[in-house]
């Protein structure tokens, strides 16, 4: 039996509103420690992790671990029927196929209940390793949201650079360029208004603004946002939900064309077979370049070790062995569920090869 009673019903509404446009269907996992969700978007570029600890609920009963598949859009519709001050109670049987939402007004003069059918969603929990980041920026969440919104009127990508001078957000578009610099500022009346920068090394990464703007929908949940950056890892954008938990967004960086061409030059030279067509002629050199609008997910994004892979297989991005001379090459099938629009950015996934302990990526037609 599962029974959760949350006095701050409006908080659950805000959580759903902040993730429903990124993920359509997901499993909510309930255990003795709390109520959680982890899911990737359909393009396998972003991942969202939500945790609401059991201590934050007025009443929390979970007899055994249970996973409930839900359509987040439908769940958000039901929660919109609750007032911001209503008390929300969720109930589900261990082997049931529905979940019940009950909304009570603060004066308890109005009680509503809604039933929603659960879904059977085939997904697996991904391993996210604990990592040390080269730079961590803490700043007001409203300011970060405003920066992302303003830059999206100029371009469709943002370059986040952290140096001794501060953190710079830059973009470039058809009409021009924009640069916004935020310097460390701790001389404020309220701690949540401070901008704090912790830097081990300078870092500069490029991200899609449409994802960043989607992340900022969690702004009503927290006064501050924490942005963790490292050149070899996806960015982490975290909003703490008071003392109750958090929402964390992980986003793979975009790979610029000039960097990609340099990184792939050596592997291409060492793999003549990958650089020749079926008739033995070499492909055009331009084919080895990667479009700057395409992304690649780093290996750290979906798994923390080979052992974790055995215990927790990757979700959605299932692998298949390429039939050919080299049976060790694996190709990730990350085709989105729906065909992208003309303006959408499509991720191009590439096989990985080991070289001196580092993972290198190379283009294979």
UniProtKB/Swiss-Prot annotation:
Pfam families: PCNA_C (PF02747), PCNA_N (PF00705). Residues 282-301 have a biased composition (Basic and acidic residues). Residues 61-80 bind DNA. GO terms for cellular component: PCNA complex. GO terms for molecular function: DNA binding; DNA polymerase processivity factor activity. Residues 262-365 are annotated as: Disordered. Residues 262-281 have a biased composition (Low complexity). InterPro entries: DNA_clamp_sf (IPR046938), Pr_cel_nuc_antig (IPR000730), Pr_cel_nuc_antig_C (IPR022649), Pr_cel_nuc_antig_CS (IPR022659), Pr_cel_nuc_antig_N (IPR022648). Signal peptide: none annotated. Keywords: DNA replication, DNA-binding, Nucleus. The keyword DNA-binding applies. One of its GO terms (biological process) is regulation of DNA replication. It is found in: Nucleus. Belongs to the PCNA family. This protein is an auxiliary protein of DNA polymerase delta and may be involved in DNA replication as its carrot homolog, typical PCNA. The larger PCNA is perhaps processed thus bestowing on it exactly the same function as its homolog. This is Proliferating cell nuclear antigen large form. It comes from Daucus carota (Wild carrot). The lineage of its organism: Eukaryota, Viridiplantae, Streptophyta, Embryophyta, Tracheophyta.
